């Protein structure tokens, strides 16, 4: 999620399975950006986050192989096929479902448009700062993520300049945003 580079997950899963390992894939960043084929890649567990595709915050999904004997995390009640007690968030579930339908049906079109915007952004940055380093530039990557370094330009100055040029950017990772380091 920092570089946008798409990892060779199918190869990783094949190696893990060869050694009898269970495989969990955090696909929060992938939904709506790359095709996820449960039949093609033999994940044991796959997790998704609704807020990454416009669904309400706090809703997600755990997709798991039904051959796995998964133990409930919270006992009581029959909710979520007996896997978790408590009232289900019906509005969140519905919102996630609707967002997933929308994003899955528009992934290819959206990715093509976003890729062209990404390429435009990179070209514009190169004209402003030819020394810019784009990490994973030649790799297979999602359309919406760029990791770059602007040598000799302080981060706060770069943020202000890019903001004035109508680009939405951040300095550092989302999980460290707003923290003093």
PLM features: residue spans?
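Pyridoxal 5′-phosphate
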Residues: 1-181
């Amino acid at each position: 999620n920092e570089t946008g580079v798409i990892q060779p997950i199918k190869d990783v899963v094949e190696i893990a399975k060869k050694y009898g390992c269970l495989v969990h894939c955090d696909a929060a960043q992938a939904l709506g950006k790359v095709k996820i084929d449960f039949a093609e890649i033999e994940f044991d567990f796959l997790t998704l986050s609704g807020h990454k595709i416009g669904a309400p915050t706090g809703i997600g999904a755990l997709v798991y192989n039904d051959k796995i004997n998964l133990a409930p995390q919270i006992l009581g009640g029959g909710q979520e096929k007996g896997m978790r007690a408590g009232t289900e968030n019906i509005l969140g579930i519905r919102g996630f479902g609707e967002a997933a339908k929308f994003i899955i049906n528009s992934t290819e079109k959206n990715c093509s448009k976003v890729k062209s915007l990404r390429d435009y952004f990179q070209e514009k940055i190169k004209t402003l700062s030819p020394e810019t380093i784009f990490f994973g530039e030649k790799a297979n990557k999602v359309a919406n993520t760029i990791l770059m370094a602007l040598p000799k330009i302080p981060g706060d100055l770069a943020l202000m300049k890019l903001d004035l040029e109508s680009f939405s950017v951040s300095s550092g990772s989302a999980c460290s945003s707003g923290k003093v380091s």
